[in-house]
């Protein structure tokens, strides 16, 4: 089970957090299969208030392999339902070797900015991202998927893909004016 102590922080030296992660080949090794399970398990437990408190976990909607110091193109994403009558997640999968094959010109950003399990401090500012994306990735069985995502799930997946490329969310914040976003940016969240 992954705990907060296992998650690499952005101020730690000698980690793979800022490296471009290696592509994953199939079939997955036993270690890679376990990593995929562990990443998703962290998200599931962290989104359960009682269990998160029991294990001292910060809630998350995404966790990438480089965040646990493993340089592999793998991330778990679990965007919970926003429908009180249906608790089916909006998006839930372990995305392996993900590639954004198309993206909207329209940008989107969270009104409260973004956070990250690898960043312990609050960093104010808008993180402009593409509002809609088409994502191509492989699952743990090696099956290829192509999905269209918009708004929050698109932002979450772009955040996780950034981790696979050695990029952190605050790299996207305008350094001179943190609360400036491209004209026409859609805000939500």
From Swiss-Prot:
It catalyses: N-terminal N-formyl-L-methionyl-[peptide] + H2O = N-terminal L-methionyl-[peptide] + formate. Keywords: Hydrolase, Iron, Metal-binding, Protein biosynthesis. Fe cation binds at residues 116, 159, 163. It holds the Pfam family Pep_deformylase. Binds 1 Fe(2+) ion. GO terms for molecular function: metal ion binding; peptide deformylase activity. Transmembrane segments: none annotated. Its cofactor is Fe(2+). InterPro entries: Peptide_deformylase, Peptide_deformylase_sf. GO terms for biological process: co-translational protein modification; translation. Its EC number is 3.5.1.88. The active site is at 160. Removes the formyl group from the N-terminal Met of newly synthesized proteins. Requires at least a dipeptide for an efficient rate of reaction. N-terminal L-methionine is a prerequisite for activity but the enzyme has broad specificity at other positions. Belongs to the polypeptide deformylase family. This is Peptide deformylase.
């Amino acid at each position: 089970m992954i705990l907060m102590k296992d998650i690499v922080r952005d101020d730690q030296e000698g980690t793979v957090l800022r490296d471009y992660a290696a592509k994953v080949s199939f079939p997955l090794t036993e270690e890679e299969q376990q990593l995929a399970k562990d990443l998703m398990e962290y998200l599931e437990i962290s989104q359960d208030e009682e269990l998160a408190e029991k294990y001292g976990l910060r809630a998350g909607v995404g966790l990438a392999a480089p965040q646990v110091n493993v340089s592999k193109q793998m991330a778990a994403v679990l965007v919970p339902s926003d429908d009180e009558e249906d608790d089916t997640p909006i998006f839930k999968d372990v995305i392996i070797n993900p590639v954004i094959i198309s993206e909207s010109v329209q940008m989107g950003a969270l009104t409260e900015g973004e956070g990250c399990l690898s960043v312990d401090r609050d960093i104010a500012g808008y993180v402009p991202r593409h509002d809609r994306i088409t994502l191509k990735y492989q699952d743990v069985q090696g099956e290829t998927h192509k999905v269209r995502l918009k708004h929050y799930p698109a932002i979450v997946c772009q955040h996780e893909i950034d981790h696979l490329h050695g990029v952190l969310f605050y790299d996207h914040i305008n350094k001179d004016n943190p609360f400036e976003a491209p004209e026409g940016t859609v805000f939500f969240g």
